[in-house]
């Protein structure tokens, strides 16, 4: 009788444990939500920039595997990004001047409570940059503005821990470039930022948000990149949806072919959020 009772108890505990652990391949939602104002995030949309320029993002990030318990979640996934610089011309023409590619893998872990969560995201990625035919001036048979194509690539590991309370999330980050060309680019990037989704004025249709991201990096000398965005999101606050936003950027260009060029611009855009 005692042996039978132990067997029943063991089976019950096994059932409870298995019910508390959920494993899923290719889940619908990302485990770690993209950091809203961070430039290097999966985006699918476009932004009209001041100065008759346009940024076009065609990017995705997918978790391959996710393991969840009652209040934790671990995931492994992959990233494929392209972000391009276009020039606005008459007759609705937008020649593509420059394009950057990113691909890599990521892992994420978070702990969930009633109103808050904390965790981290780890990424291992490669970026390369190229001029495109829209940068070439057929009239003079040369690249426009005296620019020349140059080799730009970097392989890096990025670590971003974060903490969220209700709609407010703060994060810090460190990126180490273990291989980079050109050599005058520093190997360390320090990052700090936040995003705030104002659920307390959620209309049931959309929610307003603001976000800011700062990166300190070195290209010959230390300099900072500032990225600010504010807008409204339709859909799930912490999931899929569509966003309309104003953004402002100042700092060294995000396009690799212009990596040492300082830029400052405003933009209005739309993005399909993962």
Language-model features: locations:
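Outer-membrane pore/translocation modules
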Residues: 73-191, 261-262
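Residue-level signature of outer-membrane beta-barrel architecture
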Residues: 62-64, 109-111, 159-165, 176, ...
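Solvent-exposed loop/turn segments connecting transmembrane beta-strands
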Residues: 48-55, 70, 114-115, 179-188, ...
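Transmembrane beta-barrel strands of outer-membrane/channel proteins
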Residues: 44-46, 78-82, 120-126, 172-176, ...
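Outer-membrane beta-barrel "beta-signal"
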Residues: 263-274
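Transmembrane beta-barrel domains of Gram-negative outer membranes and organellar outer membranes
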Residues: 20-111, 145
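Short loop/turn motifs that connect adjacent beta-strands in outer-membrane beta-barrel proteins
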Residues: 21, 26, 65-76, 112-118, ...
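Membrane-embedded beta-strands of outer-membrane beta-barrel proteins
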Residues: 58-60, 105-107, 159, 192-194, ...
